[in-house]
From Swiss-Prot:
Organism: Hirschia baltica (strain ATCC 49814 / DSM 5838 / IFAM 1418)
Reaction it catalyzes: a quinone + NADH + 5 H(+)(in) = a quinol + NAD(+) + 4 H(+)(out)
Domain of life: Bacteria
Keyword Membrane listed: yes
Protein name per the record: NADH-quinone oxidoreductase subunit N
Protein function: NDH-1 shuttles electrons from NADH, via FMN and iron-sulfur (Fe-S) centers, to quinones in the respiratory chain. The immediate electron acceptor for the enzyme in this species is believed to be ubiquinone. Couples the redox reaction to proton translocation (for every two electrons transferred, four hydrogen ions are translocated across the cytoplasmic membrane), and thus conserves the redox energy in a proton gradient.
């Protein structure tokens, strides 16, 4: 039957939605006794969805639901990485949620529904499917940002994110309406084959602006530092990894497949957004003392580097974007694991000064942080350097020499705040009590990410790059 075939194509999202709905029933029935089990159930569902998505990367492109839904090898890999990282982000949240009186089963359900939204927007083959997926992710994210009801900062973060996110959603809907109005089609294939027009160009620009907001690209980044600082740390761990990769992958996929004929127009726009993001992220982070705000500016800069691959266009650009974002989210997961591990008996700490003397009190954590910082900064021979090399190479092949120069400048400037973290850990001393031991899953995420970023083991990137390159070429 066609419906069974359609569901098999959308199997990862069907699994997530099905388990989430079962979770709603179990949570309503067993209430508090289901809180801890819900995270394990959600993580298993996300891991299962990642496995199903990975299995789809080896098959040809396929569509479902009368062309509303499409899966290609490129999309399947983006889904697999997003779901896998989301599962880890859910597991590391347990200790924090328990200590902060946030251990509610609704947290897991919101992450699962948001992850299902990621999958829908990645597989969208129609304007309305795209909008539905993005809004499913966004609505879950707004609630997650304000999930700590006892924190004024969390409520403020959720409100800011909601208000500005609603504006971006309006831009997206307006852009979609312009594209539909000037082409008469909502299907991506039909839009790609439609005649060019000025109205379609305006619609493209509005869609690009909305997706840039969702990805935290400058100059649409203003919500990011405040939300990262105010939202609970496990929520920010999720925000900064899985949805970030999914949004950038969606942007790349739409630009390459739907608006490919407008390449000369949007390549310049994305190149400018990339340059602004790299510079804003580099210079904005210099003045930060809060680690979460610093990592917010780091994420803005790193989205700029990923968009360099989008601006490069074609297959090399698509492969470089997904390679870079995969390395970035793994490294970021480890860094936020360290932020989760930064707690004393009186609660969480998240200032740079709280890292003072870490090399003496917690040498293993200091070494891990050093490796991860060097990786996200792009210092050779860490994994992050190879990620930047891939996007720089793609930009050079497209003769975007000025953009590569901006990227180099941004990388050098951003070393200023990355090295502040290293200096605090290794050169300063502290009279404060030592940090408490990290939770088990937090330690696993920290040292797992450190191992993947370590020079001896970056050979996995060559294997991954080959797979992603093949997937990008196939679809």
């Amino acid at each position: 039957m066609d419906i069974l075939n359609d569901i098999s194509i959308a199997a990862p999202e069907a699994l997530l939605i099905g388990v989430a709905l079962i979770g709603v029933l179990l949570g309503a029935t067993f209430k508090q006794s289901f809180n801890g089990l819900s995270r394990l159930l959600g993580a298993l569902a996300l891991a299962g969805a990642a496995f199903l998505a990975a299995s789809q990367s080896a098959v040809d492109a396929s569509t479902a639901f009368n062309g509303l839904y499409k899966v290609t090898p490129f999309i399947a890999i983006a889904k697999a990485v997003s779901y896998g990282v989301g599962a880890i982000a859910l597991l590391v949240a347990g200790g924090y949620l328990h200590r902060e009186n946030m251990n509610k089963f609704e947290y897991t359900l919101l992450v699962m529904f948001g992850s299902a939204g990621m999958g829908v927007m990645l597989s969208a083959n129609n304007l309305m499917t795209l909008y539905m997926g993005i809004e499913t992710l966004s609505l879950s994210s707004y609630v997650l940002a304000a999930f700590n009801r006892d924190s004024r900062r969390s409520a403020e973060a959720g409100l800011k994110y909601f208000v500005l996110g609603a504006l971006a959603s309006g831009l997206l809907l307006f852009g979609c309406s312009l594209v539909y109005g000037y082409t008469g089609f909502a299907s991506f294939e039909q839009i790609a084959a439609a005649d060019q027009s000025i109205g379609l160009t305006f619609g493209l620009v509005l869609i690009l602006m909305a997706l840039s907001f969702k990805a935290s690209a400058a100059p649409f980044h203003v919500w990011t530092p405040d939300v990262y600082e105010g939202a609970p740390t496990p929520v920010v761990t999720f925000f900064s990894t899985a949805p970030k990769l999914a949004t950038v992958a969606v942007l790349a996929n739409i630009m390459f497949t739907v608006f490919g004929v407008y390449e000369e127009s949007w390549m310049l726009i994305i190149a400018i957004v990339s340059a602004i993001s790299m510079l804003v992220g580099a210079f904005g982070g210099l003045a930060q003392n809060n680690i979460k705000r610093l990592l917010a500016y780091s994420s803005i800069a790193n989205v700029g580097y990923a968009l360099m691959g989008v601006a490069a266009g074609e297959v090399n650009g698509a492969a470089s974007v997904l390679t870079y974002m995969t390395i970035y989210v793994i490294t970021t997961l480890g860094m936020f694991g360290i932020v989760l591990a930064m707690r004393r008996r009186d609660g969480q700490v998240e200032e740079i000064s709280d890292l003072n003397g870490l090399s003496t009190s917690r040498p293993g954590l200091a070494v891990a942080m050093t490796v991860l910082v060097f990786s996200v900064a792009g210092i050779p021979p860490m994994a992050g350097f190879l990620g930047k090399w891939v996007v720089f190479e793609a930009a050079l092949k497209s003769e975007l020499y000025w953009l590569v120069a901006v990227g180099v400048i941004g990388s050098v400037v951003s070393l200023g705040y990355y090295l502040r973290l290293i200096w605090a850990m290794w050169a300063k001393t502290s009279d404060e009590e030592a940090l408490e031991p990290a939770d088990g899953m937090v330690s696993v995420s920290i040292y797992g990410a450190t191992i993947l970023a370590f020079p001896v083991l970056v050979i996995w990137i060559g294997w991954m790059t080959g797979i992603i390159g093949t997937a990008a070429a196939a679809g």
